[in-house]
Amino acid sequence: MAELATIARPYAEALFKACAAQPGADLGSTVAWVDELAAIAADPQVRQLADNPKIESGQLFDLIAGVVRAPLSDAARNFLRVLIDNGRLEALPEVAAQFRALVNRQSGSSDAVVHSAFPIDAAALAELGASLEKRFGRKLNLSVQLDESLIGGVRVAVGDEVLDTSVKARLEQMKAALVA
């Protein structure tokens, strides 16, 4: 089977072009519903159901549309129906990632994942975001993931760049220096 990135690219590009063609289209809300649908499609139980040949595409569509938090827009319903009818539901998480990349490219921003040993409050996250935007030279869309193994500090991943200021990383550097 073809790689998911190859399958997902035309769907992500078509969705992006369709959103860009609509006057006053809100790409942020589109990213939100695409991400939500991707999370549902990535669920192992949904995958198992989608792979079951006894389940019709209409049943699968109704199930997924019924699970989302808010009612789907017509565009979201049509997009989901196309993916299901073409047997491409497994590509939806990759479609979401590529769509986010297209939106970020247009806005000149990047997604950044902040790994922290402890929860970060809104004020500290805003301050961290401002300093990271200065460091990376672009607007960042921050998301936080807790990782207690870091002991303290943060590790930030922006695309393929990583900034690691965690206690764990410093301890590993000290260990390497002492062993060498």
UniProtKB/Swiss-Prot annotation:
Predominant subcellular localization, coarse grouping: membrane
Localization per record: Cell inner membrane
GO cellular component terms attached to this protein's record: plasma membrane; proton-transporting ATP synthase complex
Source taxon at top rank: Bacteria
InterPro entries attached to this UniProt entry: ATP_synth_OSCP/delta_N_sf (IPR026015), ATPase_OSCP/dsu (IPR000711)
Coiled-coil blocks: none
Membrane topology: Peripheral membrane protein
Listed GO MF terms: proton-transporting ATP synthase activity, rotational mechanism
Keywords: ATP synthesis, Cell inner membrane, Cell membrane, CF(1), Hydrogen ion transport, Ion transport, Membrane, Transport
Record keyword Transmembrane helix present: no
Annotated Pfam families: OSCP (PF00213)
Role noted for this protein: F(1)F(0) ATP synthase produces ATP from ADP in the presence of a proton or sodium gradient. F-type ATPases consist of two structural domains, F(1) containing the extramembraneous catalytic core and F(0) containing the membrane proton channel, linked together by a central stalk and a peripheral stalk. During catalysis, ATP synthesis in the catalytic domain of F(1) is coupled via a rotary mechanism of the central stalk subunits to proton translocation. This protein is part of the stalk that links CF(0) to CF(1). It either transmits conformational changes from CF(0) to CF(1) or is implicated in proton conduction.
Record's subunit section: F-type ATPases have 2 components, F(1) - the catalytic core - and F(0) - the membrane proton channel. F(1) has five subunits: alpha(3), beta(3), gamma(1), delta(1), epsilon(1). F(0) has three main subunits: a(1), b(2) and c(10-14). The alpha and beta chains form an alternating ring which encloses part of the gamma chain. F(1) is attached to F(0) by a central stalk formed by the gamma and epsilon chains, while a peripheral stalk is formed by the delta and b chains.
HAMAP family, A to Z: ATP_synth_delta_bact
Similarity annotation: Belongs to the ATPase delta chain family.
Protein name per UniProt: ATP synthase subunit delta
